[in-house]
């Protein structure tokens, strides 16, 4: 995360809501001295007050075989980002920068059992289909008998038990109001511009 505390977000509810709103995450881990990176959509679980993003990977993914013994990982959710031109500032002698929002969760990873994996897939579909309303939601009931179970064999589920949760919302908070608002104006209708104005 960014070292400047002005960009730091520590409100747990805000951070979890951000991940839920940006559920396609990057999973980074080091296992046996080798770095691994994978991507997956997640569903956030509240397990008796313990927060855990559930995810799934193809059985062909290089990280998947390590799920059975577990490992430590970081899950990174990213949101809007934008290049900021110094031409947009009122102040002189500035340099370009990048504004962005991201949240990282660190913890230990364990495999999901078959029932947990099925629940994850059902919940993930429901979560994402809800974003498509008023479209009638897709469910696996629409699939031919046995097809879902057959496809299930091609993936493995995992759960990251969150021990550290941090966010960086870098929106030019370190700039004078005139510079920050000038940059927001320069971005026009870019989604991050509205965040910079508030």
Task: Identify what each model region corresponds to.
Residues 54, 74, 106, 157-161:
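Beta-strand secondary-structure signal
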Residues 2-26:
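Short, basic/aromatic recognition patches
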């Amino acid at each position: 995360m960014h070292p400047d505390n002005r960009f730091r977000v520590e409100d747990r509810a805000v951070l979890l809501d951000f991940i839920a709103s940006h559920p396609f995450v990057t999973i980074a881990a080091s296992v046996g001295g080798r770095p691994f990176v994978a991507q997956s959509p997640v569903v956030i679980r509240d397990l008796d007050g313990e927060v855990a993003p559930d995810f799934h990977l193809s059985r062909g993914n290089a990280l998947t075989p390590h799920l059975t013994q577990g490992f430590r990982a970081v899950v990174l959710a990213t949101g809007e980002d934008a290049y900021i031109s110094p031409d947009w500032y009122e102040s002189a002698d500035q340099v370009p920068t990048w504004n962005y929002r991201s949240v990282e969760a660190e913890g230990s990873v364990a495999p999901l059992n078959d029932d947990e994996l099925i629940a994850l897939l059902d919940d993930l579909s429901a979560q994402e289909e809800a974003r498509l309303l008023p479209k009638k939601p897709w469910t696996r009931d629409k699939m031919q008998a046995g097809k879902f179970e057959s496809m299930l064999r091609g993936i493995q589920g995992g759960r990251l038990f969150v021990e550290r949760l941090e966010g960086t919302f870098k929106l030019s908070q370190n700039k004078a109001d005139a510079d920050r608002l000038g940059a927001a104006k320069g971005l026009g209708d870019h989604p991050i511009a509205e965040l910079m104005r508030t």
